[in-house]
Each structure stands twice: as C-alpha cells, then as structure tokens.
C-alpha cells in the first residue's frame, strides 16, 4: 500500500494525494526486473512492459497503481508496510523539476532503504513544513558556499620596458661580454699625467683641433726634417769650400824662400 504523510509527528494519516500526470503509462507495466541507486538517493527501476519492451522508470511513474512497486520493495528489503498506514517523514533528501514544479524526494521514519523513498509535490508536504523549510535553507547555504567570492583585483605597477627587460633577461652584449676584468691599478706617475691632462685648460680647448690636425702635422714634420737635413748638408759643404779657399790663399801668399846652391841662404847685398 502507498505511504501517507501524517499531520505533525504522530497524527492521523493524510489520505488525499495530489495526482498529477506521470511521464509513463503504468498500465503497460508487467513486472519489475531490477533497480539501481543513482545520485545517492534516487532509485531507477528496470521495468518490462506488456509489449515485451524494457524501459527505465522511477517511483513517481508508479503513482496511481503502486501495487507492483510495493510487492517488489517487500521482496528486496524483507520489510513489509505498516498495516495501519501511518508513516512519518524523517527528512527531505533531494528534489528535481518536473514540468517546472519541484518534486521532493523524502525518506520515511523506520524505512532507511532507498527503495522506500518517495517523491511528493510540495502541497503534499503541508504537515512537515518545518522539514521542507530546513531543506530549502540548506540548499541556499550550499549555493552561497559554492559561489566564488569576487575579490577586488589590484592593478600591478607597470615596470618600464627597459628596466623590466634588463631585470628578466640580460642583453646580448652583456651575455657575450662575460665577466668584467678588474681595472688595472695606476701608478702615481700615470695618475699625475692624467690629472695634468685633465686639468689643463689649454689642452681641453685644443684637444679636438689637435685630433683633427694630427695627419697634417705628421706630413709637415716629415717635410721639415727632410729640409733640415738638406740645409745641414749644404752648410757642411759650404764650410768645406771655405776651408779649401783659405788653404789656397795661405799657399799663394806665403813668401818664397830661395836657397843658394852654395848653401849660403838667400842673396844679400852689402
């Protein structure tokens, strides 16, 4: 026999169920072959039709003529219905939408096996509104808990491209350069020369002009040295000519001494 809700916890059974059209015609059901539990609480039954065809049906599809289903439940659970027909809802397990309306799955007190669970419309649960309200609140809490919380995203500070690239990946020049060699130590003399070169205002002023005039100065220096050599050779030649002339003059102007063949010197008149 069908289970009925009770008014309150221990009341008189409510006998008037709200009948709604099911998705299948139970008049064609011949026998239940087996069942399986799906989604923890629901039970799907494998049913053979009078035509010999096999279909899958739920507890809701047997509404109006559940004698076939009741016999199967007793056989599986080895538990019979209460002959008085009084049953109390222990809790609401789940629900699904049928033609836009919620159809609730309930568990009965003293009948823990899933095959005893029944699907009922909300208007059939008037006597257990507290249980239905608790179930609805639990569903809302689950929905809120499963909704990801939106946290304000902080915009990261933009890093300049040059600095970012330098920090993440070294440039090609830095990779090829390798380790930097230590700077050679400078002697006091070199440091002094460098200081003088740096601090000399004249050097700083004409530094660029000197760099530009280096090729001309080199050519001019070579020509000057060549001319100096030629002039020096000419001076030496002139000096030698002057010495020759002086020697000739000495030879030509010197007095000629004549000797007598007799050995008495030059002729003298007394």
UniProtKB/Swiss-Prot annotation:
The segments labelled Disordered in the record are 1-24, 143-229
SMART domains per the record? CHROMO
Keyword annotations from UniProtKB, A to Z = Coiled coil, Membrane, Nucleus
Q: Where in the cell is it found?
A: Nucleus inner membrane; Membrane
Chromo domain segment(s): 87-147
Q: What is the protein's major site of localization?
A: nucleus
Q: Where is the composition biased (Basic and acidic residues)?
A: 205-229
Q: Where is the composition biased (Basic residues)?
A: 151-167, 187-197
PROSITE patterns per the UniProt record, alphabetical: CHROMO_2
Recorded superkingdom: Eukaryota
Membrane protein topology class: Peripheral membrane protein
Q: Which GO terms describe its cellular component?
A: nuclear inner membrane
Entry GO MF terms = methylated histone binding
A single GO BP: regulation of gene expression
Q: What happens when the gene is disrupted?
A: Reduced anchoring of heterochromatin to the nuclear periphery which is exacerbated on an mrg-1 mutant background and is partially blocked by RNAi-mediated knockdown of cbp-1 or atf-8. Altered nucleolar localization with nucleoli positioned away from the nuclear periphery. When exposed to hlh-1, a transcription factor that induces muscle differentiation, 25% of embryos continue to develop and the embryonic cells do not transdifferentiate into muscle-like cells like their wild-type counterparts.
Assembly and oligomerization: Interacts with mono-, di- and tri-methylated 'Lys-9' residues on histone H3. Weakly interacts with methylated 'Lys-37' residues on histone H3.
What is the role of this chain?
Answer: Chromatin anchor protein which binds to methylated lysine residues on histone H3, thereby recruiting heterochromatin to the nuclear periphery, especially in embryonic cells, with a lesser role in differentiated cells. May be required for the correct positioning of chromatin and nucleoli in embryos.
What's the protein here called?
Answer: Chromo domain-containing protein cec-4
